[in-house]
Amino acid sequence: HNRVLELNQTADGWDVVTEKGTISCEHVVNAAGLWAKQVGRMAGIELPVSPLSHHYLLTDSIPEVAALDTELPLTVDLEGFTYMRQHQQGMLLGIYEINHQHWMMDGAPWDYGIELLNEDIDRIENELTLGFERYPVLQTAGVRNWVNGAFTFSPDGNPLVGPVPGKRNYWSACAV
């Protein structure tokens, strides 16, 4: 990995200027995560994404989960604004925050090292309550760890995936 410094459209594709040199390519895919907005601007595109604070919790080991021979699938509760998946021998409950908090509207600073953000459990209390009601195993499982980190979202919560209109051979894979 190395940082993209410029994107220059050419007659037959793109020149991607990085910290380690220039790469000429036919197609560019913006999959820059927390830096997607800045990388889009390098191509003259204003992507409707920004990093938000995103909470999830990890449970202690759950005997029923530990006893399984296969990994449980991801479960999403769109009405409850939560998702849950297996994490080692416990579970991970993630929150799609109704009262979301923007972290950096213009994207993460280039030197951001993926440090965690301060927890704000009060802000996600309603979603947590719904999650604990929908997934009863959480009511008896201990919480091993709370995590609040930055994650890039679009305004409607959907991913921006596919070709970008008006930019030949420029693709987006953002907010996924």
Residue locations for each model-derived region?
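Short loop/edge segments at beta-strand edges and connector loops
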Residues: H1-N2, T18, N145
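A conserved short coil-to-beta-strand element within the FAD-binding core of flavoproteins
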Residues: H1-W14
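Short, hydrophobic/aromatic-rich segments at coil-to-beta transitions
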Residues: D12-V16, P73, N169
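Core beta-strand elements of the Rossmann-like FAD/NAD(P) dinucleotide-binding domain
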Residues: V17-H27, A31
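Flavin (primarily FAD) binding-site architecture
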Residues: N30-I45
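Central beta-strand plus flanking loop segment that forms part of the substrate or channel wall
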Residues: A43-T70, N126-T129
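Extended catalytic-interface subdomain
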Residues: P73-A108, I124-E125
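C-terminal catalytic lobe of FAD-dependent flavoproteins
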Residues: E79, Q88, D111-V176
